[in-house]
Amino acid sequence: MTTASASNAASSAIPAVNAETPVRVRFCPSPTGTPHVGLIRTALFNWAYARHTGGKLIFRIEDTDSARDSEESYHQLLDALKWLGINWDEGVEVGGPHEPYRQSQRGDIYQDVIAKLKAGGHVYESYSTPDEIEARHKAAGRDPKLGYDGFDRHLTDEQLAQFKAEGREAVLRLRMPDEDLTFNDLVRGEITFKAGSVPDFAVVRANGAPLYTLVNPVDDALMGITHVLRGEDLLSSTPRQIALYRALYAIGVAEYMPEFGHLPYVMGQGNKKLSKRDPESSLFLHRERGFIPEGLLNYLSLLGWSLSADEDIFTVEQLVANFDIHDVLGNPARFDIKKAEAINGTHVRMLAAEDFKERLVPYLRAAGFVGEILTPRQEEILAEAAPLVQERITLLGEAPEMLAFLFKADDAIDVADDARKGLPQNLEEVLDAALAALEPIGEWTAENIQTALKQALVEDLGIKPRAAFGPVRTAISGRRISPPLFESMVILGKDSSLARVRAFRG
């Protein structure tokens, strides 16, 4: 059997990734729950770096936890990435030279690697139970929660035989090197883990099943990953992966040591780490509310990176052209929903008119205002109304409430309480004057409507301009605030507009 020191010496000479090595990054989530913004931010940064460098993004699935993994979650991941336009070069659904890309289908590959690690003396059988480890710590006056103590590293053949005779089952542990482990984090700079601070760790269960601690780096090595870009919560696992990579190089599985970069935590309200349970962490909730991919990608990019100190708004193309993992900040990034909405609003206003109109349809459909196929009249209303709200909303989900009155029948307008409260005492007089002014109009244009109402209500009745059109707005839309009134009346047409004012007049 190779001694630990010999093994460490043989395996520590693994070459580093050099500047000529084509960039290969990966996104490797577990299919559990619904996609959250922290996970998608990780996918985005990997994608942006791959596209910026002309490299490749590999998308694989870590689905070895059968109790928690689900096909529903897997398809939600696909949905999320496709909606955002985050595409991948190799992986699930698209294939590639390193298939299969689901860990649950790679069992034979892992068993082959395990056999080589055992033959090379990089792993050893560990029979100690958690209770025994804790008891040894207590007996030595140490904290019983220190973790594994290395007891099984140097078991004699007699001790091994005795444990086997007792019917014990062994896990396999990787030998950690007896030296400091230092690496240069692409985000945080040089980091050192002192010798002895990370105990030998289990890589294979007693039943022979490989653990995540083994399969994740093995997949990275076999797929030639050059840059491991992941969340800060995985920083503490890096020394174990460095040690494992040395062993994988020694047995011919790894070609080089990848570079590591740990992305900052995403914080929520009260400067607490954003939890999956926090509403703002749910990607699909943001989509339902009306975020568009361009706006959300822009904001997620700002969670640890920026185009420049004074430039918060940029396109996906600008992100790709400028993104460098070395520019990512290590400080925690706070998810500010108000800022996210404001940025989204800017991108909504940047959409071409036809594109904006088409993106409204699913939200109008979800609200029940249009069917699966729009009628010609609904198409006409939407084409004329969309420009009226594009400058006034930050989320697409705000549009149905603003446009509802245009799609409703004249006798289906419900007057909101706040609109009713603001009506003047002489409401009937105002509405009678409005009707008298509107009925004679021949060419039903916004300009003619405004001129007629201004003369009747402001000039003749002496109502202040700010309050003059409120009763008509309420009659037309049922709301105190609506898209531009005169343009809305043009969309409805003269007959419908007059019918609504008469109905409200009673």
Curated annotation (Swiss-Prot):
Its EC number is 6.1.1.17. Keywords: Aminoacyl-tRNA synthetase, ATP-binding, Cytoplasm, Ligase, Nucleotide-binding, Protein biosynthesis. A motif ('HIGH' region) lies at residues 29-39. It is an enzyme of class 6 (ligase). Monomer. Belongs to the class-I aminoacyl-tRNA synthetase family. Glutamate--tRNA ligase type 1 subfamily. This is Glutamate--tRNA ligase. The lineage of its organism: Bacteria, Bacillati, Actinomycetota, Actinomycetes, Micrococcales.
